[in-house]
Structures are given as C-alpha cells and as structure tokens.
Amino acid sequence: MLPELRVLYFEDLEVGLTEILKKEISSSDVVGFAEITGDRNPIHLSEHFAARTPFGTRIAHGLYTAGLISAVLGTRLPGPGAVYISQTLNFRAPVRIGDIVEVKVEVAELIPERRRARLACTCSVGDEVVLDGEALVKVPKKEEADPLAMRMGGGRA
C-alpha cells in the first residue's frame, strides 16, 4: 500500500518533526526490485543459494530498504516538491522476506538560508536497527506551491 501524500513546506518544518512508515517485505517486492535494477544476486532470489550464506535465507537488497526512506521523503516528510540532495547509509543488519521494516524520518536540522532540512533516517526490524543514515533535502516554500501537488496531497495534513 502506498502512503497517502502530505505536502509540507519549509515553513511547516521544525526540529523533531517525525514520520513513520511500516512495510512488510514480500518476496515479490524483492524479485521486482531485482528486475528493475538488474541486481540478480542469488542471495536475494534463491533460497537454495541463500541457505548456504551466513544469513541462512534470502535477504532484501540493502538499497530496497533504503528506498523506503525515499518513500517517506517523497510522500510524507517533507512530501511532494522536496528534492533529495544527499543521503548517507549505514547497513547494520539484513532484512529478510516477511520482516516488517519500520522507517523513521526525523527533522534533525533546518538550514533556512538554503531551505534545506537535514533528516535522521532509521530503518528497524523490531528493536534492531538494520539501516541508518542522514538525508539532506531542499524543501519548497509555500509561495512556490505547485497547485497539482496541493490537489494530489490535499495540502498540509
């Protein structure tokens, strides 16, 4: 299920503002990601192969998990109109088929003169952090609002 769109502008942001997305990782998600990217490493696609690895079973692509951060940034915090500038990623643990990943994005710093927000990003499975990092995004001001984004996202939630 896709997250509902929410449009936030730079003026709406404050340090500590947080958004959370939860996603159960399915085999079809992993296969689809492999097809789209061409990363057909058998650790993601073959249970037989993966059983002989230290993980013991198939795991999701690390960048698939990281892509869930992009889902939050593009749809909820800050949402449509935000432009990704950079992202750091630390892969801490594997994500397995059937795991429920909780993605947490939190505003860590606002840089008003450039309309940028630094965001702390964490992906967890249960109590275990599987991925963390930091994103830098450029956020539009209200006066730059795109009427289409407003209609799609319904404005500020």
From Swiss-Prot:
Disruption phenotype: Cells lacking this gene lose the ability to grow on C1 (methanol and methylamine) and C2 (ethanol and ethylamine) compounds.
EC nos: 4.2.1.55
Lyase listed as a keyword: yes
Catalytic reaction annotation: (3R)-3-hydroxybutanoyl-CoA = (2E)-butenoyl-CoA + H2O
A GO cellular component entry from the record: fatty acid synthase complex
GO biological process, one term: glyoxylate metabolic process
Ranges where the MaoC-like domain occurs: 22-120
Keywords: Lyase
InterPro entries the record matches: Fatty_acid_synthase, HotDog_dom_sf, MaoC-like_dom, UPF0336/Enoyl-CoA_hydratase
Gene3D superfamilies the record matches: Hotdog Thioesterase
The UniProt record lists the keyword Lyase: yes
A single MF term (Gene Ontology): (3R)-hydroxyacyl-[acyl-carrier-protein] dehydratase activity
UniProt cross-references to CDD domains, sorted A to Z: R_hydratase
Function of the molecule: Involved in the regeneration of glyoxylate from a molecule of acetyl-CoA.
Protein name per Swiss-Prot or TrEMBL: 3-hydroxybutyryl-CoA dehydratase
Organism (species): Methylorubrum extorquens (strain ATCC 14718 / DSM 1338 / JCM 2805 / NCIMB 9133 / AM1)
